[in-house]
């Protein structure tokens, strides 16, 4: 019985993730159909990962801040062709938004009244 409960939770996790991902893409389909670097994505983070190397670019602060997620994304996107890098950035950004929705719907937030 415990195996079924765990399997159901995993299925629910992926189902909620897929639905929220699709909803975010339907809201702005150009994120997938016409991907492009946005703001610092290409000018700083991808450029630093490409020229300085993935590890050095991650520990290099940008304007006094460590932009960890963005720089790790840039470092991972080096494994892809250049034309795939912007869509990779967009998929990671949409996924992070999906995880926020999933967190708000999780049992950890059950003590808070999110909806009236």
Regions found by a protein language model. Give the residues of each.
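Start-transfer (signal-anchor) and selected internal transmembrane alpha helices
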Residues: 1-24
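Membrane-interfacial loop-to-transmembrane alpha-helix junctions, especially the N-terminal start
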Residues: 10-11, 59-63, 110-116
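Alpha-helical transmembrane spans of integral membrane proteins, capturing the lipid-embedded, hydrophobic core
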Residues: 13, 17-21, 67-71, 90, ...
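Helix-to-loop transition at the C-terminal end of transmembrane segments
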Residues: 23-42
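Hydrophobic, membrane-facing alpha-helical anchors
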Residues: 40-52, 96-97
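Short hydrophobic/aromatic helix or loop-helix immediately within or flanking a transmembrane segment
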Residues: 43-49, 59-87
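Transmembrane-helix motifs of polytopic, lipid-linked glycan transferases
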Residues: 91-115
């Amino acid at each position: 019985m415990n195996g079924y409960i765990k399997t159901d939770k995993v299925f629910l996790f992926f189902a909620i993730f897929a639905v929220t991902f699709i909803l975010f893409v339907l809201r702005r389909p150009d994120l997938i159909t016409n991907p492009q670097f946005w703001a610092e994505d290409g000018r700083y983070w991808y450029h630093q990962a490409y020229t300085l190397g993935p590890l050095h670019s991650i520990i290099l602060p940008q304007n006094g801040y460590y932009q960890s997620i963005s720089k790790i994304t840039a470092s991972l996107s080096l494994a892809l062709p250049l034309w795939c890098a912007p869509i990779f950035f967009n998929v990671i950004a949409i996924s992070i938004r999906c995880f926020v929705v999933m967190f708000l719907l999780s049992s950890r937030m059950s003590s808070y009244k999110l909806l009236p």
